[in-house]
A protein has these predicted regions:
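Conserved donor-binding/catalytic core segment of Leloir-type glycosyltransferases
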Residues: 21, 201-221, 227-231
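Short alpha-helical donor nucleotide-sugar binding micro-motif in glycosyltransferases
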Residues: 270-271, 278-283
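Conserved acidic donor-binding segment of nucleotide-sugar-dependent glycosyltransferases
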Residues: 324, 328-336, 344-349
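A conserved mid-protein helix/loop that constitutes part of the nucleotide-sugar donor-binding site
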Residues: 33-37, 217-232, 249-252
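A short, histidine- and acid-enriched strand-loop-helix "catalytic/donor-clamping" loop
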Residues: 129-148, 160-163
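Aromatic "clamp/platform" in nucleotide-sugar-dependent glycosyltransferases that forms part
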Residues: 291
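Donor nucleotide-sugar binding/catalytic pocket of nucleotide-sugar-dependent glycosyltransferases
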Residues: 155-199, 205
Length: 387
């Protein structure tokens, strides 16, 4: 039994309908909100419970503090965890097999790909449990393009799945690549776990020109690229004020380079969710130079704070939100292009206002309610008439 888990968190209610079970790597702030909403809707539908089984209490590179679940039941599976990098983790939790046998779910949701998900998929096949596979991934970030073991794992998990769930058409393309019929894919958008407590402030009340928010690494988040863009703006005669929220291996390098250049830069380190509204509302422009985020909820956090975004095309949010809906600027990862684009956005208040208006039109489609509705649309055919 996982530490802190009660028997009621693990075993189904014998008097009620069989539960829905989600197997995931680790809880995140937005998935906690999602599962609370999904649990509420399932309970209201037919009294069905939602159980969430995590492979690890928390990813090592994350510092999120998660509130305890109120409406869904959560347990952490014992097993092996390899922290391969700041963004890559490998989970092997064979305990998922007896746990699923005890829970006897009416439907199973597998959140992404790992050996643990393969164990769960095998158990579901043996017990004829209908399975949904969910991924944030898009073709550009799919490791199956380059790795035969990754391709095999994904095909083994996706093959025969009842449906797929993801936040973008790109996620549907990834699942289709591994055998899911396209008509079985259902959109369930990603969304911020918080909403701004007040209307966004005007630009005149924002003390910083540029904001970076995320893990301070180069291989995924592009933190060194961000540094080069800031220094490039200075070389064009524009010493900008900068705020950096987050931590990681490049922090010392970034601090030193900005200090040597005589630039005003504030480094907050890691911040909890409660501090984020003030952070995002403190800058006139948010830079998201991602080199491979599967999505990028930080983009939506900036947009809902009235902060326009300049992003790379190498993320789900860059292509599936900013580019698709014209609510942000997307540029190739070329420093000179980003310097020019950033300065143009900072100098053109009407352009920033146009981007804000476009974001206001599209963000209502990227909410917790819309995400829950996507899950329910995928689950309803599986739960109809099932005890």
């Amino acid at each position: 039994m996982a530490a802190g888990a009660r028997p009621s968190d693990i075993l189904p209610d014998a008097s009620g309908p069989r539960p829905v079970v989600v197997v995931t790597g680790a809880l995140a702030p937005y998935t906690h909100v999602l599962y609370e909403g999904l649990a509420e809707r399932l309970a209201g539908r037919d009294g069905r419970a939602l159980h969430v089984l995590s492979c690890t209490p928390r990813e090592r590179a994350r510092q999120w503090v998660m509130p305890p679940p109120r409406l869904y039941r959560h347990a952490v599976l014992p097993g092996l965890r390899w922290h391969r990098s700041s963004i890559r983790n490998l989970y092997v939790n064979p305990a998922v097999v007896p746990r699923l046998a005890a829970l006897r779910p009416a439907a199973l949701v597998l959140n992404d790909f790992s050996p643990t998900m393969l164990f769960a998929r095998g158990a579901a096949r043996l017990r004829r449990i209908p399975t949904l596979v969910r991924t944030d991934g898009v073709p550009e970030t799919d490791p199956g393009q380059r790795s035969a073991p990754h391709r095999w794992l994904r095909r083994a998990i996706v093959s025969g799945a009842a449906a797929g769930i993801g936040p973008s058409a790109g996620s549907g393309a990834v699942l289709a690549r591994y055998g899911l019929p396209p008509e079985r894919f259902v959109l369930s958008p990603l969304f911020p776990a918080w909403t701004p407590p007040a209307p966004p402030p005007p630009d005149s009340a924002r003390p910083y020109d540029l904001l970076f928010c995320g893990m301070l690494n180069e291989e995924v988040k592009g933190a060194r690229f961000f540094t080069e863009v800031v220094l490039g703006c200075r070389d064009r005669g524009r010493p900008l004020s900068v705020r950096v929220a987050g931590d990681g291996p490049l922090r010392a390098e970034m601090e030193a380079r900005f200090a040597q250049a005589g630039l005003s830069a504030r480094f907050d380190g890691f911040l909890g969710q409660e501090a984020l509204p003030e952070v995002y509302a403190s800058a006139r422009l948010f830079l998201f130079p991602s080199r491979g985020d599967v999505w990028g909820i930080v983009v939506q956090e900036a947009l809902q704070s009235g902060t326009p975004v300049l992003a790379s095309p190498h993320s789900g949010a860059g292509r599936g939100l900013l580019e698709a809906h014209g609510c942000g600027a997307v540029r190739p990862m070329v420093v000179a292009d980003w310097v020019a684009a950033a300065l143009r956005l900072l100098d053109d208040g009407s352009l920033r206002e146009d981007l804000r208006r476009a974001a206001e039109r599209v963000l209502p489609h990227f909410t917790a309610e819309a995400a829950v509705a996507g899950y329910l649309a995928a689950l309803e055919p599986l739960l109809h008439g099932r005890p």
